[in-house]
Structures are given as structure tokens and as C-alpha cells.
């Protein structure tokens, strides 16, 4: 199986006239992985083994992850090539979309999808996952866009305008989601607007 995969990678390199890097995160229930800063060292090791290339192709499959890690990865790869392209066979959502937007070229199959840049924050301060009550480490991810959507619902759809009611909504939310996580949501949203 590995031998077949490596042969396919060589074929892609030949077809694209490029050096190929592969980054796949998992989305199988219970085994989900995301774009994370810890991958940068692995990419540095691979890229250091290459000389400066004319073109690098990143084969990417991901549901997303840390936006800063995605942006850092894009900048890292661009240091090692004149042309950077992303090859998407299926999904490059959220932070994967951000990586793709940083490339010179995006190549997608007919069924491939990009998605909104909607990172989910994961930290020890996130709400505990009620489906895993015996594991205090099990935390729910907090979607940046879901928090924004909650406030948009209150302000626009429900037309709540007075300061006290908005304060009560914020207090209620901060009882469910730690205030420092809410601060990270704001920071992440600002960061996304700057990058994308």
C-alpha cells in the first residue's frame, strides 16, 4: 500500500513538474485531527531536504484547524519555491481554504470543496464535552463563526438593541464559554479578516 502511494506521488510530481508535499488530516469520528502548529517542524525537516525548488505542490485534505499554523505553513512553503500550488482531491475547509488562498494556483477535482474560514478554537478552557462526562480533558471546540452568529441573531433577527440586554446576552454566553476563550474568538476573527 505504501509502495503504491509513493508511486502515485511520483506520478503526480511528474505530471505537475513539481516537488510534492502531502498533508492530510483525519476526519474519522473519534480520530479527528486538525491543522496544528506542531506540524511546522515536520514540514521544515522535509523542506530543508529540498533545495530551493521552482515549484512545490501541496496535496491537501483537511477539515481545518489553527489559522495561524495554516498561514505559517503557507509562508514557510513559499520560502522554498518560486511557485506554490495546492492540489485538492476532496476537502480543504476552513484553515485549508486559507492555505489554498496563499498559493499561486489551486487545482481541484470536480467534487473538491473549499469552505468558509471558520476555525474552531480548542483549549483547556473550552466547555467540557457532556458526551464524555468521565473525561475532564474532553472539551468541545468553539466555532468562531457560531459565536458571531449568536450575536447576529440577537442584534439583527431578534432586534435586541438596548445595552443592558446585550450585556445580559454576553454574561449568559460567558457562563457557558470561558471569557478568555471568547477573547480568543474575537482575536481569531480579527486575524482571519486580516489574512483572507
Model-derived regions: residue spans:
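Terminal-region recognition feature
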Residues: 1-98, 102-196
Amino acid at each position: 500500500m505504501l509502495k503504491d502511494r509513493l508511486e502515485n506521488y511520483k506520478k503526480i510530481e511528474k505530471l505537475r513538474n513539481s516537488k510534492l508535499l502531502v498533508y492530510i488530516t483525519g476526519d474519522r469520528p473519534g480520530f479527528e485531527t486538525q491543522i496544528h502548529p506542531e506540524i511546522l517542524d515536520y514540514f521544515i525537516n522535509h523542506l530543508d531536504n529540498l533545495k530551493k525548488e521552482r515549484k512545490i505542490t501541496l496535496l491537501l485534505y483537511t477539515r481545518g484547524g489553527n489559522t495561524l499554523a495554516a498561514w505559517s505553513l503557507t509562508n514557510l512553503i513559499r520560502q522554498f519555491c518560486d511557485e506554490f500550488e495546492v492540489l485538492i482531491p476532496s476537502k480543504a475547509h476552513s484553515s485549508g481554504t486559507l492555505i489554498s488562498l496563499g498559493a499561486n494556483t489551486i487545482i481541484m477535482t470536480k467534487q473538491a470543496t473549499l469552505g468558509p474560514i471558520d476555525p474552531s478554537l480548542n483549549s483547556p478552557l473550552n466547555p467540557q464535552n457532556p458526551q464524555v462526562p468521565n473525561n475532564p480533558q474532553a472539551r468541545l471546540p468553539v466555532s468562531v463563526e457560531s459565536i458571531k452568529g449568536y450575536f447576529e441573531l440577537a442584534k439583527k433577527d431578534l432586534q435586541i438593541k438596548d445595552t443592558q440586554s446585550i450585556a445580559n446576552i454576553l454574561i449568559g454566553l460567558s457562563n457557558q464559554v470561558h471569557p478568555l476563550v471568547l477573547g480568543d474568538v474575537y482575536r481569531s476573527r480579527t486575524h482571519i479578516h486580516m489574512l483572507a
